[in-house]
Design a protein with these regions (language model features):
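Long protein-protein interaction modules used by eukaryotic assembly/scaffold proteins
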Residues: 1-199
Length: 199
């Protein structure tokens, strides 16, 4: 196999990993905002369908939303954003969080093997995001208290930089960054710290 064919195959894997990482991240984060306990058994022999060695049971509604709303995933778009918003029974809306997956073309590392190292690093980044999703103010204050009579947390996805105003004293945290010969993927979290609805 020629070097160009190997490079082309590695790039195809890079693109595929970017898409599957992003869709798994959305599934995991949306499920973390449902307020339901998620129990998964450990397995010595992982199922090959468990991308990045993380068992995530897909929600059909989320998969359908991604199919209808998203045409490109990183690296084919520079930024993919997942927003969470609190909707009250009175019709008020409080933007809570924006999760961003970015493709950073300038962050290359020719020594990284896409199939093994990048795949493993994306798995670690996915697990880090899952843990971080349970440490935010939105999770602590609202996720387990949702009810149709008070408020519910909704989400939206789009292929550009975050658009929400998260109020004064919003915070930004870089969850992680992984590099490859074709560029890097990063995950950033922006979140609200003042839980007040503007009137």
């Amino acid at each position: 196999m020629s070097d160009s064919a190997t490079c082309s195959k590695s790039y195809q894997e890079f693109v595929k990993f970017g898409k599957f990482f992003t869709t798994r991240l959305v599934q995991a984060l949306v499920q973390s905002r449902l307020g339901q306990l998620i129990v998964q058994s450990c397995s010595v022999s992982p199922d090959p369908t468990d991308w990045f060695s993380v068992r995530i049971d897909e929600l059909g509604e989320v998969a359908a939303q991604l199919r209808t709303s998203v045409t490109k995933y990183p690296p084919n778009t520079n930024c993919f954003t997942l927003d969470f918003l609190l909707h009250t029974a009175d019709g008020d809306v409080l933007p809570l969080e924006s999760w961003c997956v970015r493709y950073e073309s300038q962050l290359t590392d020719g020594n990284v093997n896409v199939r093994t190292e990048l795949y493993h690093q994306l798995g670690t980044l996915l697990k880090s995001a899952i843990v971080a999703s349970r440490m935010t103010p939105a999770y602590r204050y609202y996720v387990r208290k949702q009810s149709p009579d008070t408020f519910i947390i909704m989400y939206r996805v789009y292929e550009k930089e975050p658009e929400m105003d998260l109020g004064e004293e919003q915070k930004k945290v870089r969850i992680g960054l992984v590099t490859s010969p074709f560029g890097g993927f990063s995950v950033d979290l922006l979140y609200r710290t003042k839980m007040e609805i503007d009137r």
